[in-house]
Swiss-Prot record:
This is Large ribosomal subunit protein uL16. Part of the 50S ribosomal subunit. Binds 23S rRNA and is also seen to make contacts with the A and possibly P site tRNAs. It comes from Mannheimia succiniciproducens (strain KCTC 0769BP / MBEL55E). It comes from the Bacteria. PANTHER family: 50S/60S RIBOSOMAL PROTEIN L16, LARGE RIBOSOMAL SUBUNIT PROTEIN UL16M. Belongs to the universal ribosomal protein uL16 family. Gene3D superfamilies: Ribosomal protein L10e/L16.
Length: 136
């Protein structure tokens, strides 16, 4: 699963997921899966979508993951009273804004890429769309 090797601080504030996305263009591959909605992806969801795509293309071509879960999410144990400090880090998430390219693919036909991205999108909690590289 994806997570940072080391961080400056173990726990972070909740914060807000506002603003516009960076990384809105398909830059490595030919086809991409772009987020339409706003939300957060856990490391498990990113990995599940990657596996679905890899199986769909039968390990042909190349896949790039353009998001990385770098925000720790903490949870307190069950049946614990409030207070007594912040909970333990349970999982890592990537904050997603609309327009962000999540995955890219190259070396396969558009039909196969569309099928693979459809399978991957079913694993994700945000709305996505299929995009192709625009040649200037």
């Amino acid at each position: 699963m994806l997570q940072p090797k080391r961080t400056k601080f173990r726990k972070v504030h909740k914060g807000r997921n506002r603003g516009i996305a960076a990384g809105t263009d398909v830059s490595f591959g030919t086809y991409g899966l772009k987020a339409i909605g706003r939300g957060r992806l856990t490391a498990r969801q990113i990995e599940a979508a990657r596996r679905a795509m890899t199986r769909a293309v039968k390990r042909q071509g190349k896949i790039w993951i353009r998001v990385f879960p770098d925000k720790p999410i903490t949870e307190k144990p069950l049946e614990v009273r409030m207070g007594k400090g912040k909970g333990n880090v349970e999982y890592w998430v990537a904050l997603i804004q609309p327009g962000k390219v999540l995955y890219e693919m190259d070396g396969v036909s558009e039909e196969i890429a569309r099928e693979a991205f459809a399978l991957a999108a079913a694993k994700l909690p945000i709305k996505t769309t299929f995009v192709t590289k625009t040649v200037m």
